[in-house]
Curated annotation (Swiss-Prot):
One of its GO terms (molecular function) is helicase activity. Its EC number is 3.6.4.-. ATP binds at L113, A114, C115, G116, F117, G118, K119, T120. Pfam families: ResIII. SUPFAM superfamilies: P-loop containing nucleoside triphosphate hydrolases. DNA helicase which seems to act as a postreplicative transcription termination factor. Involved in ATP-dependent release of nascent RNA. Forms a stable complex with single-stranded DNA, and to a lesser extent RNA. The lineage of its organism: Viruses, Varidnaviria, Bamfordvirae, Nucleocytoviricota, Pokkesviricetes. Belongs to the helicase family. Poxviruses subfamily. It is an enzyme of class 3 (hydrolase). A motif (DESH box) lies at residues 206-209. This is Transcript termination protein A18.
Length: 493
């Protein structure tokens, strides 16, 4: 730990990484406070901040020669086989770590690698190279299985803990596995933090972007007060301010043969309203809609839009154009609505729900990986980050209010490299609720722009449903005619 006075140059360097956000650190009294410019107080500067050689310091950090926490079950022949691009990452990491050891810098590296790159297998390879006892920390239980599979493939002795840190601490009195796979809430226990700081050298923070380290979280406190000897942050969408805790980044672009298309499903809707909708519309401009809760609630009861989403999905699925579908909503009630309707159409052998409230969901996710055809309905919170179903070929985004980081993570669910190259994403920019029409259009346009400009998707308009259904075309025509008549009549008046 480094308690330092906040001099001007140090403050400037740290503040630069927050990208305009407030800078918050632990002070010498252990309080997590905002750092003001010109402050005369001392603050705990994270160890990982000094991993970048561009940060000048006279501090000297311990290297691995000071510990003896080595993996006993390591077998080099079990190291996973990597693609050339993954080997390039390993080479970069090894080269950077040699320089860090030479300069006596902390061995902290952020692996900023695209969704579908294979961060898990690449990191397991690095783990085998280092041969050091390791803690793998994941934000939720759903990510544990993919780590378990890769760690077992490497042949490492490991233990998974999801049932509570107290139980784990009792078990660690009689056993000392080479690899611990835990959920991040374990870090709220100081005794556990002290244990892994003493007995484990390598700490892997999976999906590091899910933690805002400018907040006083368990992960923030762990990295500040119990900093590991070595640390990897893994992410496809790094959070800029988290660099303060892990300031060395490796980012290698990945070329892909995937054919990625985002289909914009446009439709004209007559205004739709119910008592419930009118009640929620009154809350749109209030404080209760600060995070667009009511905007998404309105979308969940927008019956014409929901029917369009279902019609499009059913048509594409029945035609065989898409086979392994992820349907994403923002709200749980919206997820349940789609699940029930799809279940009635296709049955429980095809339709599954990714419900965070169901403890059996992770096991169900494992079981559907082998299916040739399925529809998986879930929420952005549960499946937007880290969902491990590599065979997904299509994504239906039913919500609209999604930030850039979530968009990139979500689209990454259908960008995993497999033998089948076609990937399709469907978005729905229209709504029948006129009070949110422009807002929804703008939010969906942001999804489209990011997918095309940053992730290499090709944008196309989806016309199949309207063209294949003559009654739909007639309905649209008559609707347009009525709208034109109203405009004409109002002008005459």
């Amino acid at each position: 730990m480094s308690l330092l006075k906040m001099e001007y140059n140090l403050y400037t360097e740290l503040k630069k990484m927050t990208c305009g956000q407030s800078l918050s650190l632990f002070n010498e009294d252990g309080d997590f406070v905002e750092v003001e410019p010109g402050s005369s107080f001392k603050f705990l500067i994270p160890k990982g901040f000094y991993s970048s050689p561009s940060v000048k310091t006279s501090l000297v950090f311990d290297t691995l020669t000071t510990t003896d926490n080595k993996i006993t079950s390591i077998n080099p022949t079990n190291a996973p086989k990597l693609y050339p691009i993954q080997c390039k990452v390993v080479s970069e990491v090894v080269s950077n770590m040699r320089k860090m050891i030479e300069l006596k810098r902390p061995l902290y590296i952020t692996l900023h690698l695209a969704c579908g790159f294979g961060k898990t297998i690449t990191t397991c390879y690095l783990m085998a190279i280092h041969g050091r006892k390791t803690v793998i920390c994941v934000p939720n239980k759903m990510l544990i299985h993919q780590w378990k599979t890769q760690v077992e493939a490497v042949g490492l002795e490991h233990k998974i803990s999801i049932d509570g840190v107290s139980i784990l601490l009792k078990e660690l009195k009689t056993q000392s596995p080479d690899v611990l796979i835990v959920v991040s809430r374990h870090l709220t226990n100081d005794a556990f933090c002290k244990y892994i700081n003493k007995h484990y050298d390598l700490f892997i923070l999976d999906e590091s972007h899910t933690y805002n380290l400018m907040n006083n979280t368990a992960v923030t406190r762990f990295l500040a007060y119990y900093p590991p000897m070595m640390c990897y942050f893994l992410t496809a969408t790094p959070r800029p301010s988290n660099r303060i805790y892990c300031n060395s980044i490796i980012n290698i672009a990945k070329l892909s043969d995937l054919k990625k298309t985002i289909y914009v499903v446009d439709s004209f809707f007559e205004p739709y309203s119910t008592d419930n909708i009118r009640h929620m519309i009154k809350r749109l401009d209030g404080a209760s809609n600060k995070y667009h809760i009511y905007t998404e609630k309105l979308l969940s009861v927008d019956e014409p839009r929901n029917q369009l989403i279902l019609n499009t999905l059913v048509e594409e699925f029945k035609s065989g154009t898409i086979n392994r579908i992820l349907v994403i909503t923002k709200l749980r009630e919206h997820m349940v609505l789609f699940y029930k309707r799809l279940l009635n159409l296709f049955g429980p052998e095809v339709v599954f729900i990714g419900d965070a409230q169901n403890r059996r969901t992770p096991d169900m996710v494992k079981s559907i990986k082998e299916l040739n055809r399925f529809i998986f309905v879930s929420t952005l919170f549960y499946s937007g980050t880290g969902l491990d179903i590599p065979s997904l070929d299509s994504l239906f985004i039913c919500s609209a209010v999604i930030n850039n980081m979530q968009i990139e993570q979500l689209l990454g669910r259908v960008c995993r490299e497999t033998a089948l190259l076609d990937r399709r994403v469907y978005v729905f920019p229209n709504t029948s609720i006129k009070e949110i029409k422009y807002m929804i259009g703008n939010f969906v346009q942001r999804i489209i722009s990011l997918s095309v400009d940053k992730l290499g998707f090709k944008q196309e308009s989806y016309r199949k449903h309207q063209e294949s259904d003559p009654t739909s075309a007639c309905t649209t025509s008559s609707r347009e005619e009525r709208v034109l008549n109203r405009i004409f009549n109002s002008q005459n008046r």
